[in-house]
């Protein structure tokens, strides 16, 4: 084993944060130093050259002075017997660099902690420094040799039920954490006595996962009686009723990993499987929809819990039909009170929590980062979501109970696209190869399906922790690339059947695969790729290692499939083959036995059906009179409530522009305020049709009136999605995610009554279908604190997500008030028809109350009429701004519109209030509705259209936006409230700031918080030195000559398709080139005029951002020659964007005239930054930017390591003076800036793009390829037509070639 010291592992900011954490736990800690330690398993002795290559490979990241360590060593390593994702990628890079003697590289962190402390304190320090699921702590570097020890496989265990009877099975149930019910134990006893043998632990584990509540949805399929009355339908039966009543537009429901609905016809853009040339294929582009929850893991370990939640949902989409493509994601969180230190709110009463779960604040610091990190690295934009906190002591017939979300809701969902011929699964022929695609087996996430089916606190803490999986998004990206290559083959798609691997691991996925395909299967356990050879058979078969799919590929298609996997460097293995008889057999060649041999019907057959008996309980509630409250104080409380406050901290961490198909994200208008009601994507790059997603949830209402909470969730979804241009309400399809504390008094009846209200009544009345959903039935947390039994139980929680095809993405409405459209009116549409019910409102919650009357959907016809009128007004161009009324009521809707419009408000309540006692209820009730802005001269016509639709009583003019920064509300000429917009907006932004300050670099958080106070901030703007609508490449395109550009990617790159689309539009033939093509000599760069290195996370940014990719080009002789030859050709051009920019900057020794280029390192905020930033094009030789110098315009930013670090002050000066700086960040006033967030990475002198001296090679961190169409821009000037400003850059390259 070789030991190589690495660079310091912590930035100054992370160092001081960790030191503070440690000294809080152990006050004796006086100092801390951390550095990476690398370990190499080698065969033979490395030559001098090989040592040099290895040393350069392991030098990565920012330049930080290395210290001589002092203090006690805590060496954190991957768990012995495992291979970390870092190791597999770094080892791949080493092999690609020609280091054949390196068997494996592994990395640890050496923490040196100064101070005098006891062994018990040392244990506390060790606990704080590692993740016990995947890591261990040792005391010296030599002990790392254990990383490369090879463990012996553990044997199979039989459970002696023939000798020990039922008691033996009960003991196994408890020890293995199987969560089997009494009748299931009876069922298994009968089954194995019938087979005349003892079951193996692997078979019991497999049965428990496959038959857990999590996988089988027993409660939703159960028979019911309520108050002694037998009920006709199951819960699932009532959901399916929506499909039986209205199934038009639904292509697949209830039977696959996601539902599929009809989309639009468009030119789907992808590389031709034979020629690898990108092009558009005109075809129906159907929409798939899915929303998952990952609540249990997120309570225990929020980052991996939320991360693998997003990863699992992405796999569900990819594994739909015969393979599909995920497109856009959403994330939601519901937690208990945050209790932010120093920012505790008056309604937050501390109640405590069990040891085994983390605090609500920790969930909201770590969880969103996990979800965002997976989506970012996979390459899926995160475009909408919700965040709610609720925790309150409620008086019930049994005394006081705390209701809240100690077991959180973590929602991960999204939509994708699928080809018409792949919507239905294919046929599995006998002899088909049964394949696992993706990562290796590891001992993580064991028993997750069963664990998540229990109330938190009823299983052991170790089992809880063991059931959380860990993530490797770059592996999932490789799998998706394989799936993409397969569906792009159309009728020749080699995949006949595919499932994702989720709860229960392969033990659930493979039996489900063969059973759904009407077959049995024979499997060999030792064919499963395994990074933990010491595992027992049941651990190999049932672990929930992530990023895996199982599929059936016909024998005739196998070679083609194998070639695709090898090109994408995606691991796969043939584990078994399909058999005609429905028997499940798993052999083990190591031990020469058969751990599983059973008929499929024993595993998946009719285990006993559950029956539920429920009793209705009187609804809860208390008295709440808002009329006595101080309005100004009420506004501040409501604006601080997390459900209302700015969600900025959740949004800027997630890439929202990847794919180049995003038409509407959360951030709205020139000031980029996070208030959008709906997310919208384009079908493809050549049309204006698209897809919309929006969410609705009103969970606290369920405590007052559960069916009302369900109806309101659907109502809110519709008032949100109404902001997009949808032809008719029945085009909208819903996903319903149900969370309940099943078995808690009153909750089962609330669940049944709410499903009935939604499935049998409201949805059929609206003509809307629910083709997909998910349930989580154990939403309670119980623990004992100093002898006192405590519990927190969630309200019944229905989270609804709406999906729909969009007729015209250009007509999406936003809440931004327009001050450039003359005199305008604000109109309130109140679907509550003046009832102003205040039950469970945010105002009530901020005073520790529930109220008594819940808002509700009283008449489905009102909702239908509202939707139709809004769509008509939008189609006619009458609506300037739109915002639904939701949490916080009318007051919040109106001020959020003012925040987005950077203006004031003059509101009068004369038309809606009858007396002063009603004012608070009118401002803060959360009945369904919306506020719209229309031109004053159109107001009479707009009101008349609502009247004609039967909504005349619901509409009233409530005021006007005004150009000064004042918000004033009056009634009968008397002032009700007056305040400054910027101060209200600061109150609204403060909760987000407080979390950001704890999570990220606090200086950056403060700078962003201060921007809100800038009254004179002009927002984003465009100042161009060229005509955006002129196509300067047109004369060359007309000649029909299309030069070839190599669209270069490496494993983990995810931005290639939009890059190809931009070059294609500019008149190039864009060709898909993988680094594996260059390393294998399949592609010759001499065939290309241009090369572009795309954005993403090559090798998951192992060995530094873009550095592994660059080094596999520098240290592989064939690749080095190819790149060097290309760069030296004077007729060639090169572009590197984001990860491609980082990669190219590390190739500067091959690129003439780039010797002073910087290295790109971690952003100053220490966070992934996804924003729209202003840049100014500099005077330079860049062939891409000719004729654009001096232009200022917005551009998409999405990176975690974009800070330009120059080798020296002299190099920075040289870059500046040589005319090689191509782009700089500027603030909204047009001044070059280093200030956050206008400069999101803190690069010196605003530098974010550079060129070589002759201008042929240009690198930049921003993403012009995501905003070349006008509709791709989060904000754009009204006068832009089809092209965005950045299209000019690609056309410049086409002109240069000629």
UniProtKB/Swiss-Prot annotation:
Pathway involvement of the protein, from the record: Purine metabolism; IMP biosynthesis via de novo pathway; 5-amino-1-(5-phospho-D-ribosyl)imidazole from N(2)-formyl-N(1)-(5-phospho-D-ribosyl)glycinamide: step 1/2
Region named Disordered: 301-328
Keyword ATP-binding on entry: yes
UniProt record, GO biological process: 'de novo' IMP biosynthetic process
GO molecular function, a single term: metal ion binding
Enzyme Commission code(s) on record: 6.3.5.3
Keywords: ATP-binding, Cytoplasm, Glutamine amidotransferase, Ligase, Magnesium, Metal-binding, Nucleotide-binding, Purine biosynthesis
Localization terms from the record: Cytoplasm
Quaternary organization: Monomer.
Family: In the N-terminal section; belongs to the FGAMS family.
Protein name (database record): Phosphoribosylformylglycinamidine synthase
Source species of the chain: Pseudomonas fluorescens (strain ATCC BAA-477 / NRRL B-23932 / Pf-5)
Recorded name of the encoding gene: purL
